[in-house]
């Protein structure tokens, strides 16, 4: 409201100055002749009114643009009403939907019940507090860690290595009742090295958090031990949580544990770790029978509700159990509606029954995995089969449920003008999505999610429909989806403030179309029914991309949102493209034509046109068909993007290669532009962008442009490496160059699995269809596939992680880890599923 008032006052002031000038001119004209002065005054009055209305009209349009940017799209949801509720989808209601913590579960709800695990090794470093582990971090020294098995639904087993400890976290869900069923955890702590003479003293912290008016009632046992926690929420009904006494691993023999408890108001989800740390300040003695006592730091030990907060703030209840490794502890959630009418003693999912359930689920996972991907049948080694299982499990175990409001800068239609506005809150929305990395990117990314779902849909098409439906639910009234979804306090706490805001003028590669293509080709009734519901939103999303990112000439496209040409940047980044620092035109301008975006739009027009025809959407088909035909017409791409002097496709823009970073004390490294100066030309940056017509299979097998692209791809001076295709030619001036003094190369030579997957899919295609390059494509396919699979396997065996990217020089994993987002595509590469 205040911003609108200032604009109105500014518009009024701008309208007053021409009026004063008009009056002055009228007086001068009046001395020459009254009639002429009257006529001139009238004419000027008309001009003034027109100007005022013009300014007013622009303000109204800007105001409407802001409103549309912050308004959800009116099209019907692609998912059924209340699709996340236990009544509609009970099998998905509970899950490991907290990817940023080492182990935890929550309900798929805006106000969830959350459970989680923290742990600490007591006395590991005398005189210092124990290191409390909770959230996945890059630099906390924990690792490797990750899911050995996870079926995305009801079962998982994870191993975590932390110094001298190995933790195994397992869970099983059991259906029943009306509120999502029951679940049981088993956490096993063992020394990493066998035959360890001294077993470490370890504390586990099991906690429950509510987020509002929900009820938690702990039942007190002896010496700080909770018998159980009773609770009630509107979505779960009545329930009970029980922490069983610790036992020897693989046995039912009980072990002596020491107990502490803490109960408080919910401090806010990002502050749970800090609250436990701050209260872990009292010394206690662990006294097993027949053994010497050992000191440990514990929680206060009382069951009074500490630091009671405002009504509706929620509760935070922690049970600490401390003992010497090795041991196992089980934590059980029982739904009241599932328990009704059941013999609790015989039916509780604990002990031997839990062991049998875990073994049964593990066997079922392995059998289903082989049935789905057939790695053993296709001759892959046991190590490669295990890698495939880990890749799938890590991706499924990283699926999260998020709810909240993002920060958005509306699109005013004038580039750069959004910098003068304050961001606004988008409406509260849910998101069910995979994440690229639990430690570094534990939230939804639009460009990544399409690749994630290529893997997920082979395993569980229902999960993919849920994820795509949620992403399409983020559409604003214009058809825009923010490229990074930072929803809720937990997600926001892990992102620097300068990266929280999403700009409604900026796009992202429409990779959600990739799983849509698979759905369209498979023609499963459930998928086609989903696509019918989703089509209005898919169409709106594509239309926004096609219109908002239009380039300077017909059928050209340009990523909005390139960085400004600051003196510290070697080459202004293009974050919306997903390829961040990949070299583009040295001097950003409205004259740019971006090859990769043109290819994405061509693919989108093709897919949406085919989908409209399949669904009988005649009006949309009449619009999309001609657009697809124009974009795919012979010579259309050549005319805008073929660079004869480079022998490949390329971006076009205001460019010179005579740029470099030089030291200029005291500023540090600054960009220096030499000669020749920038001019409109094709951009000489040979790399992933150059391959996009090949990657997205937009070229006919007989195209004269296919051969040169295959030659460049196969040339070790350019893109070929023993570990996969590098992102930028080794001959490029930008190869492995920093973009700023503090910004190391990212898409400037490293090997990325998502693009290598697209390349393998294209080579597989062109190696199977008749054409002059069939033999060459097939040979390159076999060699590239072997290189990629071998390197990812070797790096996993050496480090225990899948990585964000891999070195083109020695194959080592680089970037963040674990990265079981699109690096999980190694599974589809092994299975030859494209």
From Swiss-Prot:
Q: Does the keyword Endoplasmic reticulum apply?
A: yes
Family, as annotated = Belongs to the glycosyl hydrolase 63 family.
Pathway the protein takes part in = Glycan metabolism; N-glycan degradation
Which residues does the annotation flag as glycosylated? 654
Q: Name one GO molecular function term.
A: Glc3Man9GlcNAc2 oligosaccharide glucosidase activity
* Matching InterPro entries: 6-hairpin_glycosidase_sf, 6hp_glycosidase-like_sf, Glyco_hydro_63_C, Glyco_hydro_63N, Glyco_hydro_63N_sf, Glycoside_hydrolase_63
Q: Which residues form the active site?
A: 580, 804
Lineage, top-rank taxon, reads Eukaryota
Basic and acidic residues: which segments have biased composition?
17-31
What is this protein's record name? Answer: Mannosyl-oligosaccharide glucosidase
Q: Which GO terms describe its biological process?
A: oligosaccharide metabolic process; protein N-linked glycosylation
- Briefly, what is this protein's role? In the context of N-glycan degradation, cleaves the distal alpha 1,2-linked glucose residue from the Glc(3)Man(9)GlcNAc(2) oligosaccharide precursor in a highly specific manner.
So what EC number does this one have? 3.2.1.106
The record's keywords, sorted A to Z, are: Endoplasmic reticulum, Glycoprotein, Glycosidase, Hydrolase, Membrane, Signal-anchor, Transmembrane, Transmembrane helix
Where's it found, cell-wise? Endoplasmic reticulum membrane
Q: Which reaction does it catalyse?
A: N(4)-(alpha-D-Glc-(1->2)-alpha-D-Glc-(1->3)-alpha-D-Glc-(1->3)-alpha-D-Man-(1->2)-alpha-D-Man-(1->2)-alpha-D-Man-(1->3)-[alpha-D-Man-(1->2)-alpha-D-Man-(1->3)-[alpha-D-Man-(1->2)-alpha-D-Man-(1->6)]-alpha-D-Man-(1->6)]-beta-D-Man-(1->4)-beta-D-GlcNAc-(1->4)-beta-D-GlcNAc)-L-asparaginyl-[protein] + H2O = N(4)-(alpha-D-Glc-(1->3)-alpha-D-Glc-(1->3)-alpha-D-Man-(1->2)-alpha-D-Man-(1->2)-alpha-D-Man-(1->3)-[alpha-D-Man-(1->2)-alpha-D-Man-(1->3)-[alpha-D-Man-(1->2)-alpha-D-Man-(1->6)]-alpha-D-Man-(1->6)]-beta-D-Man-(1->4)-beta-D-GlcNAc-(1->4)-beta-D-GlcNAc)-L-asparaginyl-[protein] + beta-D-glucose
Which of the residues are on side Lumenal?
58-834
- Composition bias, Basic residues: 1-10
Specify the taxonomic lineage.
Answer: Eukaryota, Metazoa, Chordata, Craniata, Vertebrata
- Report motif location: Endoplasmic reticulum targeting: 3-9
Listed GO CC annotations: endoplasmic reticulum membrane
Q: Which residues lie on this side of the membrane: Cytoplasmic?
A: 1-36
Source species of the chain:
Rattus norvegicus
Stretch list, region Required for endoplasmic reticulum targeting: 74-136
Q: Cite a single Pfam family from the UniProt record.
A: Glyco_hydro_63
- Region annotated Disordered sits at 1-37
- Where does this chain mainly localize? endoplasmic reticulum
Membrane topology of this protein = Single-pass type II membrane protein
């Amino acid at each position: 409201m205040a911003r609108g008032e200032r604009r109105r006052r500014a518009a009024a002031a701008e309208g007053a100055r021409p009026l004063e000038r008009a009056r002055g001119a009228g007086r001068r004209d009046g001395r020459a002749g009254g009639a002429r002065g009257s006529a001139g005054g009238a004419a000027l009055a008309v001009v003034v009114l027109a100007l005022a209305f013009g300014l007013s009209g622009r303000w109204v349009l800007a105001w409407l643009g802001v409103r549309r940017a912050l308004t959800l799209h009116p099209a019907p949801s692609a998912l059924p009403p209340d699709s996340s509720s236990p009544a509609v989808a009970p099998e998905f209601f509970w899950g490991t939907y907290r990817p940023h913590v080492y182990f935890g579960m929550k309900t798929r709800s805006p106000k969830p019940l959350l459970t989680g695990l923290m742990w600490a090794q007591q006395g590991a470093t005398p005189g210092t507090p124990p290191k409390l582990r909770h959230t996945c971090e890059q630099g906390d020294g924990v690792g490797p860690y990750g899911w050995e098995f996870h079926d995305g639904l009801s079962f998982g087993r994870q191993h975590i290595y932390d110094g001298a400890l190995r933790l195994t976290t397992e869970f099983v869900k059991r259906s029943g009742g009306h509120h999502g069923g029951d679940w049981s955890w088993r956490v096993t702590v063992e020394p990493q090295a066998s035959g360890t003479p001294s077993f470490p003293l370890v504390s586990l912290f099991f906690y429950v958090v509510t987020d509002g008016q929900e009820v938690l009632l702990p039942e007190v046992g002896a010496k700080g031990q909770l018998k159980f926690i009773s609770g009630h929420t509107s979505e779960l009904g009545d329930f009970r949580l029980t922490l069983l006494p610790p036992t020897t691993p693989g046995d039912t023999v009980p072990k002596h544990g020491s107990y502490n408890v803490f109960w408080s108001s919910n401090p806010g989800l990002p502050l749970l770790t800090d609250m436990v740390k701050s209260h872990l300040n009292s010394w206690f003695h662990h006294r097993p029978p027949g053994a010497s006592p050992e000191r440990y730091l514990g929680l206060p030990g009382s069951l009074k509700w500490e630091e009671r907060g405002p009504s509706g703030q929620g509760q935070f209840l922690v049970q600490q159990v401390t003992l010497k490794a090795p041991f196992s502890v089980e934590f059980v959630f029982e739904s009241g509606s599932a328990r009704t009418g059941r013999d609790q003693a015989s039916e509780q999912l604990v002990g031997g029954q839990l062991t049998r359930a875990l073994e049964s689920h593990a066997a079922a996972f392995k059998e289903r995995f082989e049935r789905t991907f057939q790695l053993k049948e296709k001759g892959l080694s046991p190590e490669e089969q295990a890698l495939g299982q880990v890749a799938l499990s890590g991706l499924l175990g990283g699926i999260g449920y998020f709810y909240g409001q993002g920060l958005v800068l509306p699109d005013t239609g004038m580039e750069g003008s959004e910098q003068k506005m304050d961001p606004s809150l988008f409406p509260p929305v849910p998101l069910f999505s995979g994440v690229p990395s639990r430690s570094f990117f534990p939230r939804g990314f639009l460009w990544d999610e399409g690749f994630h779902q290529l893997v997920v849909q082979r395993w569980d098409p229902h999960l993919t429909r849920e994820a795509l439906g949620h992403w399409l639910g983020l559409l604003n009234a214009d058809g825009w989806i923010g490229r990074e979804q930072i929803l809720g306090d937990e997600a926001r706490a892990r992102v620097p403030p300068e990266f929280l805001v999403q700009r409604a003028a900026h796009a992202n590669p429409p990779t959600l179309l990739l799983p849509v293509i698979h759905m369209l080709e498979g023609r499963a009734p459930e998928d086609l029914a989903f696509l019918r519901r989703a089509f209005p939103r898919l169409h709106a999303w594509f239309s926004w991309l096609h219109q908002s990112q239009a380039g300077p000439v017909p059928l050209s496209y340009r990523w909005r949102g390139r960085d400004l040409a600051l003196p510290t940047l070697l080459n202004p980044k293009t974050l919306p493209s997903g390829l961040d620092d990949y070299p583009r035109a040295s001097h950003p301008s409205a004259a740019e034509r971006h090859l990769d975006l043109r290819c994405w739009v061509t693919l989108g027009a093709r897919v949406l046109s085919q989908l409209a025809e399949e669904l009988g959407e005649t009006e949309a088909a009449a619009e999309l068909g001609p657009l697809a035909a124009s974009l795919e017409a012979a010579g259309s791409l050549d005319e805008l993007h073929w660079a004869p002097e480079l022998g490949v496709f390329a971006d076009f823009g205001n460019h010179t290669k005579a740029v470099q970073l030089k030291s200029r004390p005291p500023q540090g490294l600054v960009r220096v532009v030499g000669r020749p100066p920038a001019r409109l030309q094709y951009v000489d940056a040979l790399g992933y962008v150059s391959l996009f017509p090949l990657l997205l299979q937009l070229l006919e097998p007989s195209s004269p442009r296919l051969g040169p692209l295959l030659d460049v791809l196969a040339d070790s001076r350019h893109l070929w490496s023993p570990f996969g295709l590098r992102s930028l030619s080794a001959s490029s001036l930008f190869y492995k160059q920093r973009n700023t003094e503090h910004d190391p190369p990212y898409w400037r030579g490293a090997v990325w699995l998502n693009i290598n997957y697209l390349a393998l899919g294209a080579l597989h295609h062109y190696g199977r269809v008749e054409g002059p390059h069939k033999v060459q494509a097939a040979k390159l396919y076999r060699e590239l596939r072997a290189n990629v699979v071998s390197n990812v396997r070797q790096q996993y065996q050496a480090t225990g992680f899948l990585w964000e990217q891999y070195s083109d020089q020695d194959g080592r994993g680089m970037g963040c880890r674990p990265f079981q987002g699109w690096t999980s595509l190694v599974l589809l590469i092994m299975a030859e599923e494209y």
